A protein has these predicted regions:
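Conserved N-terminal ligand/cofactor-binding loop architecture of enzyme catalytic domains
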Residues: 20, 24-95
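Donor-nucleotide binding loops and adjacent catalytic segments primarily
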Residues: 198-273
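A nucleotide-sugar donor-handling region in carbohydrate enzymes
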Residues: 149-204, 208-211
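A short, well-ordered alpha-helix in the C-terminal region of glycosyltransferases
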Residues: 342-356
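C-terminal "capping" alpha-helix adjacent to the active site of nucleotide-linked donor transferases
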Residues: 315-320, 325-341
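C-terminal alpha-helical cap of glycosyltransferases
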Residues: 356-370
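Acidic donor-binding loop of glycosyltransferase active sites
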Residues: 272-282
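Active-site and donor-binding regions of nucleotide-sugar-utilizing enzymes
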Residues: 68-166, 171
Length: 370
């Protein structure tokens, strides 16, 4: 059986979800041939660079504009029509890949990839079942297309919204966003604690700047580092060398035990040690944190999908949001450190949101409809 997974590099989450599925499928059935393809890179490396850099620029430099474009593309048919036309042109470039690989099923973890395959199906260029895996906590019309056979969504609220917008209930599955199974495995927790050299009797705060690094996390560090409470701090700066170097200077002056980490492929190790995570609410980061049953403290949510992710988490008592006020930031973290009952209640909410069978359920689904 050939399974084609189409994704894109706008942020790290789409690729991570795709690779998690590939790992699980191969573990369950070594005879399955799984091909994960970065759609834009395959079509044209220059196109990939343009789309990826454009996304990063909008998200980091002009987040308000990004939020407006996100809303416009969700609400206005004219905006969607422009994107549709562009994707219909690019879609034809995928035909050689599909003809050569001959997939029995296609999975997509990015809205543009979804739209391209849906277009090819509409024009009768291909006839392959399409499963769309939505990698955030709120739906957006860019994902929703007539020729999608099945949708995988992160939560029941998304199902309700999509049904209201006309998607058939039997097409939508609230399996959760697929991630590596290590995030659900608690057997190694004590090993991780020893590996990271942490005190088992102290609370641990994990600060994550995201895969590309976020400068505002430095200000949060300065607000909380001298809180009068004995906790340990892990900082992961992401792929931002300047940010890492600035933290090196700050950490050297601190009396607190701080573990400073550059970009890591072993984020599960640090999440499993944490009592709370200070992070941006990207879809995959959120899912990984919830799988580890760790309450989130959210900052710098990009208007659009990250705001929707944050809203979902806060509504379900799995996260709190930091304001831009220094005193408020300090107070929020201090309350979570000192109020065991509040932290336990949030942790219980994370535990109740159990999506540990996501990869297993998706695997069963492709076996049913291949």
């Amino acid at each position: 059986m050939n399974v084609l997974i189409l994704t894109a590099s706008t942020g790290g989450g789409h690729i991570r979800a795709s690779n998690a599925l590939k790992s699980y499928f191969k573990e369950k059935d070594n005879a399955i041939n799984v091909n994960v393809v970065d759609t834009f890179k395959y079509i044209n490396p220059l196109l990939d660079k343009t789309v990826t850099n454009g996304y990063l620029y909008l998200a980091k430099k002009t987040p308000k504009l990004y939020g407006k474009l996100y809303k416009l593309s969700n609400d206005k048919p004219m905006m969607n029509n422009y994107v549709n036309r562009m994707n219909s042109i690019f879609a034809k470039k995928l035909i050689p890949l599909i003809e050569e690989f001959k997939p029995q099923i296609i999975l997509t973890t990015h809205p543009f990839s979804t739209e391209m395959i849906a277009y090819l199906k509409d024009k009768k260029k291909i006839n392959v079942p399409l499963i769309c895996i939505m990698t955030d906590y709120g739906p957006h019309n860019a994902w929703i297309r007539d020729n999608v056979n099945e949708y995988i969504v992160s939560n029941d609220d998304m199902m309700k919204e999509m049904i209201k917008s006309g998607v058939g209930k039997d097409k939508i599955h609230s399996f959760g966003i697929p991630i590596e199974n290590d995030f659900y495995d608690d057997k190694k927790n004590s090993i991780y604690m020893n590996d990271v050299n942490l005190n088992h009797h102290k609370k641990v705060v994990l600060m994550m700047a995201g895969s590309f690094g976020v400068k505002n996390i430095l200000g949060i560090y300065e607000d909380i580092i001298d809180i009068d409470y004995d906790f340990e701090l892990i900082i992961v700066t992401g792929r931002n060398k300047k940010l890492y170097e600035k933290f090196q200077e700050k950490v050297a002056l601190s009396e607190r035990d701080v573990k400073l980490i550059y970009f890591t492929e072993e984020i599960v190790k640090y999440m499993k040690c944490a009592d709370m995570i200070i992070t941006k609410p990207g879809g995959l980061t959120v899912t990984e944190a919830l799988a580890c049953n760790i309450p989130l403290v959210i900052f710098d949510a990009i208007p659009g999908q990250e705001e929707e992710n944050a809203d979902f988490l806060i509504k379900n008592n799995m996260a709190v949001r930091l304001s831009s006020n220094d005193k408020s930031i300090r107070n929020t973290i201090e309350v979570l450190l000192t109020n065991d009952e509040k932290l336990k209640t949030m942790k219980k909410a994370c535990i109740a949101f159990d999506k540990s069978k996501s990869c297993e359920n998706i695997f069963s689904l492709i076996k049913e409809i291949k």
